[in-house]
C-alpha cells in the first residue's frame, strides 16, 4: 500500500513539473522549447549575452534536457 502511495505521489509531482515547464517557457506552449529548457537556446542557435567585459556568445547544448515522463515506475 505504501508503494502505491509513493508511486501516485511521484506521478503527480512529475506531471506538475511537465505542465509548468511548458507554461513557463518563453515560447508559449511549444514542447520543443520545453524540451531544450536546460540549454541556452535550441540546438544550432546562438545568442549573445552582454557582460561587464564585452559580449559572450553561448552555443546551445547538443543534447536535449531530459523530458518529464507522464508516468514514473519505481520498484521499492
UniProtKB/Swiss-Prot annotation:
Record carries keyword Repeat: no
Molecular function as annotated in GO: ion channel regulator activity; toxin activity
Keywords: Disulfide bond, Ion channel impairing toxin, Knottin, Secreted, Signal, Toxin
Tissues expressed in: Expressed by the venom gland.
One Gene Ontology CC term in the entry: extracellular region
Bridged cysteine pairs (disulfide): 21-34, 27-39, 33-61
Domain of life: Eukaryota
Locations listed in the record: Secreted
Record bears the keyword Disulfide bond: yes
Primary localization: secreted
Signal peptide location: 1-18
Domains as described in the record: The presence of a 'disulfide through disulfide knot' structurally defines this protein as a knottin.
Primary role: Probable ion channel inhibitor.
Protein name, as recorded: U14-hexatoxin-Hi1a
Amino acid at each position: 500500500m505504501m508503494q502505491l502511495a509513493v508511486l501516485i505521489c511521484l506521478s503527480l509531482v512529475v506531471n506538475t513539473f511537465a505542465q509548468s515547464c511548458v507554461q513557463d517557457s518563453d515560447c508559449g506552449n511549444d514542447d520543443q522549447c520545453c524540451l531544450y529548457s536546460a540549454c541556452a537556446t535550441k540546438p544550432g542557435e546562438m545568442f549573445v549575452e552582454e557582460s561587464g567585459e564585452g559580449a559572450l556568445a553561448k552555443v546551445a547544448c547538443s543534447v536535449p534536457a531530459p523530458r518529464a515522463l507522464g508516468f514514473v515506475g519505481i520498484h521499492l
